[in-house]
Amino acid sequence: MDGASAKQDGLWESKSSSDVSSCPEASLETVGSLARLPDQQDTAQDASVEVNRGFKEEGSPDRSSQVAICQNGQIPDLQLSLDPTTSPVGPDASTGVDGFHDNLRNSQGTSAEGSVRKEALQSLRLSLPMQETQLCSTASSLPLEKEEQVRLQARKRLEEQLMQYRVKRHRERSSQPATKMKLFSTLDPELMLNPENLPRASTVAVTKEYSFLRTSVPRGPKVGSLGLLAHSKEKKNSKSSKIRSLADYRTEDPSDSGGLGSTADAVGSSLKQSRSSTSVVSEVSPSSETDNRVESASMTGDSVSEADGNESDSSSHSSLSARGACGVLGNVGMPGTAYMVDGQEISAEALGQFPSIKDVLQAAAAQHQDQNQEANGEVRSRRDSICSSVSMESSLAEPQDELLQILKDKRRLEGQVEALSLEASQALQEKAELQAQLAALSTRLQAQVEHSHSSQQKQDSLSSEVDTLKQSCWDLGRAMTDLQSMLEAKNASLASSNNDLQVAEEQYQRLMAKVEDMQRNILSKDNTVHDLRQQMTALQSQLQQVQLERTTLTSKLQASQAEITSLQHARQWYQQQLTLAQEARVRLQGEMAHIQVGQMTQAGLLEHLKLENVSLSHQLTETQHRSIKEKERIAVQLQSIEADMLDQEAAFVQIREAKTMVEEDLQRRLEEFEGEREQLQKVADAAASLEQQLEQVKLTLFQRDQQLAALQQEHLDVIKQLTSTQEALQAKGQSLDDLHTRYDELQARLEELQREADSREDAIHFLQNEKIVLEVALQSAKSDKEELDRGARRLEEDTEETSGLLEQLRQDLAVKSNQVEHLQQETATLRKQMQKVKEQFVQQKVMVEAYRRDATSKDQLINELKATKKRLDSEMKELRQELIKLQGEKKTVEVEHSRLQKDMSLVHQQMAELEGHLQSVQKERDEMEIHLQSLKFDKEQMIALTEANETLKKQIEELQQEAKKAITEQKQKMKRLGSDLTSAQKEMKTKHKAYENAVSILSRRLQEALASKEATDAELNQLRAQSTGGSSDPVLHEKIRALEVELQNVGQSKILLEKELQEVITMTSQELEESREKVLELEDELQESRGFRRKIKRLEESNKKLALELEHERGKLTGLGQSNAALREHNSILETALAKREADLVQLNLQVQAVLQRKEEEDRQMKQLVQALQVSLEKEKMEVNSLKEQMAAARIEAGHNRRHFKAATLELSEVKKELQAKEHLVQTLQAEVDELQIQDGKHSQEIAQFQTELAEARTQLQLLQKKLDEQMSQQPTGSQEMEDLKWELDQKEREIQSLKQQLDLTEQQGKKELEGTQQTLQTIKSELEMVQEDLSETQKDKFMLQAKVSELKNNMKTLLQQNQQLKLDLRRGAAKKKEPKGESNSSSPATPIKIPDCPVPASLLEELLRPPPAVSKEPLKNLNNCLQQLKQEMDSLQRQMEEHTITVHESLSSWAQVEAAPAEHAHPRGDTKLHNQNSVPRDGLGQ
């Protein structure tokens, strides 16, 4: 099969480019040797029906034939010549095919394109899942569910294209100005059913956008497998018309007309070739007109079966296999062609010869089996095609119904949208008119606002005058309180300065007592130093004698031992060097061994890694070779399979792509519907939000009413508090008057002032609390006012919006119904109400602004008071913090200075040690760096190798994964192929079993016939033998004759039976042909019914259009109804809201009037307050006079204090002089003590050397004694000399012991003296610390006094300025109020406003405020000078005491060194104790 198909492919390729007229001759030459069978005629008939279906669905013979025939590509440029008179399909087909084309031609004028293109789109939708080959392979077809999925995908793609086009059109419309009356929708059914309007319909655009669909995969029924022939009457261009994309379905005007001529043209159109190795080709030569007729009928049948969606390949394949078998039997069983008997060819040689029974039975059985198989195959194929068409129609009906419902919903929604858009345009017009009206109203409002501003300016000028009066009153009260506080601060500072003077005198007395004690201690120390010097002179004389004796002894020993000691030192040095070198060598050897072990391990690791690399590379190469071999083997195995599967896969890919296109189109449509629904929901949400905003405005109005009521209550509370304060102030004024009259003397006045100050402090606290309450109330009032302003603005905006909306609604409803007129009247009334509301709001704003100005003036006064108080507090806090910081920093700096000196000495020692250590470390580092470089090189190699290993491992893993993937894919392919092969094998087995059963039945019958024949032959032979043996018997002759007669009868009966068999066969064949003709007639009827179905579909489509338009109109109606209902509801809500607002505005007007009345009352009360404050001012001025007298008394006391300070400073200067003289004495003593310490150190060193030399002398004496003993044994004459020497040595030892005892005594005395000096030093330190603390306290007091003086000066300056401002303000107020004096006197109480003079004389204030001269007699300046002198004197004392402590510390250290030397000589283990004892006083001094 494959070889034949390949040869035929080559033939068709060679013929594809040749002219059409040469095709029939070539086909006759190639096909002339083959015989045509009836089943091949059926295939031709099926193909012709497919052609007719192509005409009916596509409307263009060229395109339909290309779609129907071009898929297999096996018969290029072949054309059928069918006679219309002889064809049985001709008259019937004219109603379907020719009638359709006639209708097409008639309707081409105006509506041809629309109807044809609608039909083209519908046929496109139906033919998308039916374009694939039916006879490609033996595998079973896709189930019906997959067919539906394919159709859905194709639809989705089409809908996606429509969506894209709609988006483009929508953009173009948005850029261009849209006409008003044009009804246009993005979901237009005409646009959907007219694909020429789409940009995708053009071949250029589609080839650009759908170039990925250009594949060489065939579609449609494979005509070559049906055994079609082509005969040409007309010539057509032979360009390829493979359907690559949706653009190729574009309809064209039909150029030809006629019954079967169009079918011939369709079959004869150019065909494209495809490489399908499994396609079946059967070429048949045209024998007669009946053959052509039957061939055309078979073509139509097969094409109808395939167009109906029959995708079962097995049935058609089985029918073809049966036909092929029949053709082979016919050719084999008939060698010569001389005569034709009932369709069978009989040679001339076989006329007189009858075949045997076996041959006849075999031929009959084979022919019967072939006929049964053909009938079964054809019936099965037609049954499958009809069932598949029915199922496909049912499956298509469901999504079409869904689509229709979706389209209806879409049209209804479009109608609603159009209605809403019309309403929106009208609303925009109304909005523009309303905006113009608003502009006119705004101009009127501006004029009214200007008028109100002029009135407000007048009110502001009056209120500013009131504010200035209030501010002046507040400033006067503040100045009086400040003066009182300053007087109290001055009194306190004077008392503190008196206390400080007393403390300073006490400290002076203490210091004098301490100085006397110091003088006594110094005298005692001088006496002890004198005694020590005498003792040291005696000790020095004794030491000189001992040194002379020692030199005589050492001179003798040095000569003998010098050489020995030098040699010993050299030997020791060499030994030390040796040990050091050995230790270094051992250390280096250990390090080298460790490094070598590391190198060995690294080398081992390197070798191991190299081996792993080699093994991995071998494994890689082996796996690569294996994978390559396996791939080659699998490729060789699968090449044939892949070649077979490529076409199927490509076809499936195209089906999937079409499916995805349809799915995407559906999704986009659904998204459009959802977007439209969302827009409608947004409109509904906007309406709901407007309603909610109205409700919120109502709530805010209600809340503001409540807030206004609360404000009124708070205002009443504030008025009550103000009245109470006025009463308290009057009571205080009366009490002050009583106090002025009672007290005349200064002491009594002071007591009264203190009491009044206490009472005033309480009043100030009370007033401060009241101020806080007022501030809180004012802040709340401010916030409420801001909220009211915001609410008013929002109300204005809401009113403007509502007025605009009402006017829009009025105009819409005026156009549509009489109800709108009623609404217009209501909106006019609402406008008037809104204007009233606006006017009321303007009045409210004016009142609120006036109230706000009053509140701001009060706030400013309160804020200024707070700011001054906070500023003074913050300055005091900052000064205190700076003092504390300075003292802490001074202490920390002193501690750090001492610590740094200690650290410096330690660091110098450590640096010397580190330099020596660094040199040794640098040498070792150089050696280690050299070694490290080698190790680094090895490590880099290791890292590179490990990375290479990792990369190789990754490559191996990737290759293994790829191999596994390839193996799994190949396994899956093999499984698929195995399943296909098993299904094919099962079918072949079933056919083989049926064939074997038939052959076994026939073989049994043949065996029975042969057995009977052999039996008869045996009987005949016996009879012949008997006849030859006994020819004389007449009886036998008679029997033989009878048998011969019977034989002749049997032969005749056999001939008759054979004739009957032939008649039966011819009858069955005639019946088969009749049944086929009936089937063809039924198929023609089916085609006619399908034509009727198409007409019904057209009518249904028109019904759909009408239904969509109906839904559109219904949507418009529903939209209008919804908008009307919403307008009515909105209108009712607005009416209720306006009624509520009117009521609220009436209430607000009443409240505003009440607020105005209250404000007038408040202004009257404020005037009364101002008058009361003026009275209190006069009283305060009287109090200021009394304060001045107190200031004079304070100055007298300051003069007394100055005198005391001067006396104290003189006494301190004398004490300083005495201290300086004593410090000089102490310095001289310290110098002498230092010299003594140096000498003691030298003596101690000499004693230590002497002790070492004595030890050496003793050892040498022992050696000499040994030598003398030996010499005495040899020379007894030298014994007397030795005894003399011994006696001398004993005497020297006794002298040394006496010297040691004397040294011990001197050490004990030195210890006692040191302890005494340490105690005196500690007492001096404690006294110095006390003096320093006293100095710090005096410094603090000085700073406090300076700060207080500066504050007093500043306060006096501010008082003067305030008094001057008050005078000016009061004079101006008096000048302004001369004219309306009568009115003010009638309204205000009887107390007139007077401008009293400043109680403090100006000359005195100027003297106070002037900066002090160079030599002034003011008490503060003298105090400052005294404090500075005291500070300088205390600093000098502190320095002297520090120098004294340093000298004492140095003398003690020198004494300790002097005592340490003899102590070491006498007690070698007692050094630690002495050292510890000496270290204690040093630490104490250092501290």
Curated annotation (Swiss-Prot):
Domain of life, source organism: Eukaryota
The keyword DNA-binding belongs to this UniProt entry's keyword annotation: no
Compositionally biased region (Polar residues): 62-74
Localization in the cell: Cytoplasm; Golgi apparatus, Golgi stack membrane
Tissue: Highly expressed in testis. Transcripts can be found in spermatids during spermatogenesis. No expression in Leydig cells, spermatogonia or spermatocytes. Detected at low levels in all tissues.
Compositionally biased residues, Low complexity: 269-288, 312-321, 365-375
Membrane topology of the entry: Peripheral membrane protein
Main localization of the protein described in the UniProt heading: cytoplasm
Residue ranges with Basic and acidic residues bias: 785-796, 1372-1382, 1462-1474
PTM: Cleaved by caspases in apoptotic cells.
Modified residues (N-acetylmethionine): 1
Keywords annotated in UniProt: Acetylation, Coiled coil, Cytoplasm, Developmental protein, Differentiation, Golgi apparatus, Membrane, Phosphoprotein, Spermatogenesis
Disulfide bond sites: none
A single cellular component GO annotation: Golgi membrane
Region (Golgi-targeting domain): 172-257
Gene Ontology biological process terms from the UniProt entry: cell differentiation; spermatogenesis
Residues forming coiled coils: 358-1454
Region described as Disordered: 1-118, 221-321, 365-394, 785-804, 1372-1396, 1458-1487
Modified residues (Phosphoserine): 18, 60, 270, 381, 385, 461, 979, 1387, 1479
Interaction with GOPC as annotated region, ranges: 121-141
Subunit composition and interactions: Homodimer. Interacts with GOLGA7. Interacts with GOPC.
Domain-related comment: Extended rod-like protein with coiled-coil domains.
Function: Plays an important role in spermatogenesis and/or testis development. Probably identical with the serologically detectable male antigen (SDM). Probably involved in maintaining Golgi structure.
Name of this chain's protein: Golgin subfamily A member 3
Organism: Mus musculus (Mouse)
